[in-house]
């Protein structure tokens, strides 16, 4: 079979986020399945016959019974740390509970964060080609796909998810590898910091399942202050959050202090750049002739850009550090939680994309070389 004939069926698009996996068929508008990228294992003894079957829970089932389970994320900062669990999750995507299809029938478009170790991509290819017999594979950078979803060919994408934040400048469809910036500060770090702040208020969330409660508190009540110093001096309105056991828990200044780590990683003792610096450095590393255009086409993507006040805060930080008359435009598409997946769905269904796939035959002939030759 020629590599070009491989792509007859609808490709499967998997946006492999550190926090949430989005998967579905190319050409559709939204991902068919979306579930947390973790595995749950029972931490108690099963004493009744006919109780919950199985020793490993994935997807909605793990979410539903999380109080019984010890929860582990197989990905940390965009890099797979536990391949056995990651492969279980990928196999589950094809099960009858999710896409209900056969692995050997569909090419796979997989997303990954830029500047990831090469080994990460090689192991993924090994699983899809050798483990589940996929006919073809392509590994694409997340930010490029987000730009596809907005219908632009020029812009700088600031993508901040659960594990990684990165900025990728793209001009007329060309990504500039030397200008890509990445920091490993993202949503999960905000959740961890919020957990610490909540502990100071007298609530201790210890277990891995309770960490998920902190995550949902973050998603519901946290916001970014345009001026954090000013915000500290005024009384923050307390928000009453109802915990799963019915207790009411009041959260005050932690609401804006937690997301602050995105702009000030030093609060966590990290020495890396804040999210606004990542964006600016990435633009400044691009060619001088392109900078003005890039500043006018900043596109936000990923769940951590959904904090209330995120766009305003980013704009005020950029204005502080740039020329007075510089025009800055930030586009925040409403569907940015899914924009990487949507871009993948558009890309994989294009006719011109067919020659980009790495076919199983190419992989068998060239091995890992094929993966690096055909992916950016």
Curated annotation (Swiss-Prot):
GO term, biological process aspect, one: mitotic cell cycle
Protein's UniProt name: Actin-related protein 1
Molecular-function annotations in GO: ATP binding
Cysteines paired by S-S bonds: none
PROSITE patterns assigned to the protein according to its UniProt record, in alphabetical order: ACTINS_2, ACTINS_ACT_LIKE
Keywords: ATP-binding, Cytoplasm, Cytoskeleton, Nucleotide-binding
Family to which this protein belongs: Belongs to the actin family. ARP1 subfamily.
Entry GO CC: axon cytoplasm; dynactin complex
Compartments (UniProt record): Cytoplasm, Cytoskeleton
Gene from which the chain derives: Arp1
